[in-house]
Regions:
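Non-catalytic accessory segments flanking enzyme active sites
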Residues: 14-86, 90, 282, 291-294, ...
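Short beta-strand element of the alpha/beta-hydrolase
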Residues: 91-99
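Glycine-rich "HGGG/HGxG" loop immediately N-terminal to the catalytic nucleophile
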Residues: 57-59, 120-122, 131, 135-148, ...
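Conserved hydrolase catalytic core segment
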Residues: 113-120, 127, 164-219
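The serine-hydrolase catalytic nucleophile loop
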Residues: 100-112
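C-terminal subdomain of alpha/beta-hydrolase-fold enzymes, centered on the catalytic histidine
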Residues: 102, 238-393
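Alpha/beta-hydrolase
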Residues: 1-7, 11-16, 21-22, 26, ...
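Alpha/beta-hydrolase active-site loop
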Residues: 147-164
Length: 393
């Protein structure tokens, strides 16, 4: 086994450099106080000043280091992850996979609700052993190699859960890129995965063109086709010229802050007020993970993979077999302010759908916005499947 304990330890010099850069921030003269054209200039100024003079990274670092963090080298890739043990008899192991532009921080509010449900108004028999890896190229995980590595992360997760942690069978949950990784994991290892729970249908299925579509499916795919023109410019540039963008964001903390925080405002159920869902500290700590690890460029890799010619060919070939549903049970929790709103019949083309929940509120960052709603849906979905999990090795 290659497991080793991990603690975040950002050098003092790196924090001093950051404060200097923030003090020298040169923002455009625009004083607008709205989000209509992207990042709100007035709010960016406010955030930059708080980051420079009010935000206490060392306090946040200490909070994160109170979590059981590890790194494991799997093949040639070192993977960072949290491994939080459940409270009670025979907790069900589950791997939670985040997306972009967040990090393992997505699940911090969810972890205690899953590991110790009895302490939060739930049933102790619903407890989970929770594993939260950082995607390759995010935070403290090694970057992936180019050329389709995004679609091999499921293999890393399988080895992490079985070889490194000793779980013969386990559950999986994900959203955004996490849903793609979770699907691949379940398709490749149905004997190990007892079920999957997702907050979206992986975007890449839009490349598949079934001959017959319901009216709802047609509307959904039409909305997907509009996405690059209405909301998806970030994905286009990250998928075609990631290095160009990364040069600027890796050098400018204010630029990085704007690029990431704007998505938290746009994609959450915040009614226009991003701080109604996320505190300044939550927003900044997520950005700090990108800044201190210089991982914004490597976080773009899945987008580059998705648009790379070889990967597209791989996807089209894979589609011939992946048109059939995943063999393991799947549950979906759909949040109204997320980026896409697929109908159930679209999901049923690719998944063995056993649960479909339309949530009353919440957005793309559901585990941060509505952790209680998400936790309860995960508990209920996996409750009848618990007998299929093998004891911990």
């Amino acid at each position: 086994m290659s497991l080793r304990l991990f603690e975040i330890d950002v050098p003092d010099a790196a924090l001093a450099d950051l404060r200097g850069r923030l003090a020298r921030t040169r923002l455009p003269p625009d004083e607008a106080d709205d989000w209509s054209a992207g990042m709100n200039p007035a709010y960016l100024r406010e955030l930059v000043e708080y980051w420079r003079s009010g935000y206490d990274f060392r306090a946040r670092e200490a909070e994160l280091n109170a979590l059981p963090q590890f790194r494991a080298t799997i093949g040639s890739t070192a993977v960072h992850f949290i491994h939080a043990r459940g409270v009670g008899h025979a907790p069900l192991p589950i791997v939670l996979t985040h997306g972009y532009p967040d990090s393992f921080l997505r699940f911090l509010k969810l972890i205690p609700l899953l590991t110790d449900p009895a302490a939060h108004g739930g049933d102790a028999s619903d407890a989970f052993d929770v594993v939260v890896p950082s995607l390759p190229g995010y935070a403290f995980s090694d970057p992936p190699q180019r050329g389709g590595a995004t679609f091999n992360i499921g293999e890393l997760w399988h080895k992490l859960m079985t070889n490194e942690l000793g779980y013969a069978r386990f559950a999986a949950h994900g959203g955004d890129w996490g849903s793609t990784v979770t699907e691949h994991l379940a398709r490749s290892h149905p004997a190990a995965v007892i079920g999957i729970h997702l907050t979206d249908v992986p975007f890449w299925h839009a490349f598949q063109k079934p001959h017959t579509l319901s009216a709802a499916e047609k509307r959904f795919l039409e909305s997907i086709e509009q996405f690059p023109r209405t909301e998806g410019a970030y994905a286009v540039i990250q998928g075609t010229r990631p290095e160009t963008l990364a040069q600027g964001l890796n050098d400018s903390p204010a630029g990085l802050l704007a690029w990431i925080v704007e998505k938290f405002q746009r994609w959450s159920d915040c009614g226009g007020d991003v701080e109604s869902r996320f505190t300044k500290d939550e927003l900044l700590t997520n950005v700090m993970l990108y800044w201190t690890t210089q991982s914004i460029g490597s976080s773009f890799q899945p987008y580059y993979d998705l648009t790379h010619a070889n990967v597209v060919r791989w996807m089209l070939e894979t589609a011939k077999t992946w048109i059939h549903p995943v063999k393991v049970p799947a549950g979906f929790a759909l949040f109204p302010k997320d980026l896409s709103h697929p109908p159930r019949e679209w999901a049923e083309r690719f998944f063995y759908v056993k649960r479909w929940t339309q949530m009353p509120r919440g957005g793309h960052f559901a585990a941060m916005e509505e952790p209680e709603l998400l936790a309860e849906d995960i508990r209920e979905f996996f409750r009848p499947l618990r007998g299929h999990a093998a004891p911990h090795a």
